[in-house]
Amino acid sequence: MRTDDAPFHAHVYFTTDSRASAAALRERLLATVAPDALLFVGELREHKVGPHPVPQFECHFYESYLPRLMPALESCGLTVLVHPLTLDDTADHTTLGRWLGGAPIELDLSVLDPPGVNQGFARFGRTDF
């Protein structure tokens, strides 16, 4: 992992009705994967995964890519959580996170790693849940 640029996640949430929009956004993002910016675009997950109680897919990217990624996320019409990847998993998903689109999703914070531990680092840029 690079040490000069902070790692970030974006979680794109969808419903049965908005699944096609999520799939289209995912395909657009897959076309832009690059080792210096957008590293990973996960599969559409149709069930609860980690703290995410509704269907979603996630992207891994470096902070420097955020200005290029935000227009796509802001205009997709879906609820999106963008957050840094730090050693405080709870803060990442709450106070450090930024919600776009619809109303924030109530996350299951009980499953997050304790402060000082974040298993997300090991899978950053490689795999989703």
Where are these regions (language model features)?
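Long, contiguous binding/interaction regions
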Residues: 1-129
